[in-house]
């Protein structure tokens, strides 16, 4: 299986750097590597800020070395490689204007204003020039502009950079533009020729960067596309080049192999090949339609989840797709999330014969989230502490207006169904309930064949939160304790929480090592206040419940896409749309297989006989391509012995199995929800 070499924490010990000493010099004194995957490329300060190796502290300070093979190390290498690419582009295509160029997950991009789109031949020429720049060992040198005026003068020929300089202080710290300009000094990085000391190229940038271009040992440019300045379709059109870089050629090659495998597993491609779903233009972008094969898989996914939820004490509810706008005003969605909602429909207005409005219409919205309606269910009558925890669950379809450029098959759609739960509990119940929720999530995800997880803890953004510091600290400590007790790796996400509460995200790695965010467990201090939710405590007082948002799959559609890629289309037998197909050696043996399939259907299995005009070998190829886990063959000997022969997706067979034994084996395999594909060895030992 093709897996990318993951980022590996080296866990260097912090080093005290004396005032006035460059941190790079301190690293050399400690004889830390400057070559290879464990080479130190930047350092991390006590507050988490990354610094160049040229950074010189004003006072004695501790810094932790960051290796090239670590997540942050890779990001810095990619950011620096983006600068090299931009330098190469402007050298190859004089007059090109610079947009922004941040590191992103698994790579980087840079935007350019050019006379014409980039071609594949252009990318090859850019790569060739980049290799020359990297071989030259140019230094990355950080400089601070003395004033805004100095920056504007230096960037007079770069209109997009000038706009960023003029917007300084108004740039979203979470945006890609923040890599170029944000809080603090206005800085630029010069690419300096090590032999002559001349500045070969420079760019407005906050950094940090690797010391020299020789710290970029392996890179590739992957594609180009159209883009808009600052992602706004009303602004200038740009050309974007994507690339990636790694700490070693081996890591880059493993990434390329993974990408090739991922392309084969692309759920959009498999969805069409296996007749699972489609996206008709007549319906609109981002709205999938499930065909019989896909709907069967989806039904099995939902049914198993439904049974598990009932067994775990969840109460099923159902809410409408549309609601008055007042509800989302009350919940705060219209204040904080309006851009992600579809425009309102104005309904219930009345007009007289002359066209005068006698009753103002009301705004109705397609719901983007289920939580406000679940709160109305909680508030529909008085609640006692004896009813808590109350676990409401719904397969609730929601609608979110995603820009067309970010829609991606089933994994980023505009209409999708969440397996959405909202849990209301007392403060005393919170830790136990969170523990149960996390255990339930991991257990259920394992049922579907995912088994490699880690957790991410998103904590308070000090500039954007509701609720007291005390409740944030307590709830964050509880979440952290629950996460640590799970035994799973816990990765911090400082200041990554939504304004209304801390969150645990369950991240899952698939068969080729990619990470997918699966489930979220989100505490909410905001909505119980907005909806004035109350329960009667044991002493008769009215108290606010604590609310937990929990989406296990994220959405049915997205989880479907993840599983489809994880299994490369070969769903386990319990999920497969066609579990068994009978293939007669000749038409005369079809009635024998019809009886076998009828018995399987009577036991609740999906089984049919292929009676098409194709020859047997063609039928086997068709159903192997169609990923049918059990193919049953029958010829003269099988009929005489009241037997069948098994054929599996790997091409192996088990011949002459008595019908009763074959039916029992298949039924048991499916009932067990075995996530492995059946093979000669695994079935032979059962018959």
From Swiss-Prot:
One of its GO terms (molecular function) is ATP binding. This is Threonine--tRNA ligase. SUPFAM superfamilies: Class II aaRS ABD-related, Class II aaRS and biotin synthetases, ThrRS/AlaRS common domain. It is found in: Cytoplasm. It catalyses: tRNA(Thr) + L-threonine + ATP = L-threonyl-tRNA(Thr) + AMP + diphosphate + H(+). Its EC number is 6.1.1.3. One of its GO terms (biological process) is threonyl-tRNA aminoacylation. Gene3D superfamilies: 3.30.54.20, Anticodon-binding domain, Bira Bifunctional Protein, Domain 2, Threonyl-trna Synthetase, Chain A, domain 2. Residues 1-67 form the TGS domain. Residues 266-572 are annotated as: Catalytic. Belongs to the class-II aminoacyl-tRNA synthetase family.
